[in-house]
Amino acid sequence: MTTPDAFRDAEYIADVSGISYGNVANLTEQDANVVPRENERMRKLQLAAKVAFIDRLLRDLDILIYCELSALYYMDCSVILFAIRAIVQLIFFTPKAPPFDPTRNQPFIGAIFVSNIFCMIFHNFFTHPEASEATRGYLHGGLLIDFIGQKAPISLFRLFLLDFLVLILDLVMLGLIVERVKTTGQTSTTSTEILRVQDHDSEERGVHRTRPESRSSVVGAELDETDGHITRANAGVGEQAEHTQLLADPSEDGHTPGAKNSHPLDAFSSGEAVIMNLGLFDVIRDQWKYSTTAPPARTSSYIPSDQTAAFLRARFGLQVGPDGRVQRIES
């Protein structure tokens, strides 16, 4: 994660965020109604930066696993073992385009352990690479790639060590994918409340119109008047609380959104942010329970995303109907 690409992704997110240094800490009393929206905006920004770092780490680990598989193929000269794990890696772990975002519904645990245990058993009982005098004691590659230069025989301990390393990397990628799915789910949950804009008339009456809009105009007017009385009654209490907050240390106040001359992505750019607390046994247990539990009954029809709908329409001529069924577009 020390490559410039990861920090370039974070800098791009910071540029498009529109949040400058210190603008959250310098909010005045007139901007107090903007604090909840700024907090929500910063939270979404930090989640987007976390997803960007996870995607970069997944791509790096994916390349590393393919390098390990190539090294194993270089030593055991078995196309079958290389193909088994390469197919599992390509289907379940290799990052793909947005219409094919990873989900937790895939059988990650079974694919990881079955493929790796099969390769370990094959290395122990069936694979014994040997070189003849015709090749001067050196191994040649298998069916697809002809590697030359590996000295025979190959130690069984080295094969098991690389097999175990591939298994650990697969489990780390599984934990990252699960964390990415959870983070993306948090990002997609947005508030449906409609906020009304504060105007000059409401400001003169002492009424805050940033409360969610009511369905009834009569009830809304009554609530506005009530808000005005409450605001004037609690003016002294609010001033005292603001005075106490200004005198308090920023670290002692849990509601302080940010310090002066700081940015929400400073933790990511400085390398102090934790994108995942990885526990291999916890990841295996949670994913196994998630895979074995029955899926909940669908209460509403499936509505695909815009990218998925465009891909199905352009590539296969299909569309998802109101009942959730895939239908062919009749021209």
From Swiss-Prot:
Residue spans of biased composition, Basic and acidic residues class: 196-214
Tagged with keyword Transcription regulation: no
Cysteine disulfide partners in this protein: none
Taxonomy, superkingdom: Eukaryota
InterPro entries: Dsc4-like, DUF1746
Annotated keywords: Endoplasmic reticulum, Glycoprotein, Membrane, Transmembrane, Transmembrane helix, Ubl conjugation pathway
Membrane spanning stretches: 63-83, 107-127, 159-179
Pfam families: DUF1746
GO cellular component: Dsc E3 ubiquitin ligase complex; endoplasmic reticulum membrane
GO biological process, one term: SREBP signaling pathway
Phenotype upon loss of function: Impairs growth on solid media under hypoxia and leads to triazole susceptibility. Impairs virulence in a murine model of invasive pulmonary aspergillosis (IPA).
Pathway: Protein modification; protein ubiquitination
Compartment annotation: Endoplasmic reticulum membrane
Record: glycosylation sites: N26
Membrane topology: Multi-pass membrane protein
Region Disordered, residue ranges: 188-225
Its job: Component of the DSC E3 ubiquitin ligase complex which is required for the srbA transcriptional activator proteolytic cleavage to release the soluble transcription factor from the membrane in low oxygen or sterol conditions. Required for growth during hypoxia and triazole drug susceptibility, as well as for virulence in a murine model of invasive pulmonary aspergillosis (IPA).
Oligomer and partners: Component of the DSC E3 ubiquitin ligase complex composed of dscA, dscB, dscC and dscD.
PANTHER family: DSC E3 UBIQUITIN LIGASE COMPLEX SUBUNIT 4
Full protein name: DSC E3 ubiquitin ligase complex subunit D
Organism: Aspergillus fumigatus (strain ATCC MYA-4609 / CBS 101355 / FGSC A1100 / Af293) (Neosartorya fumigata)
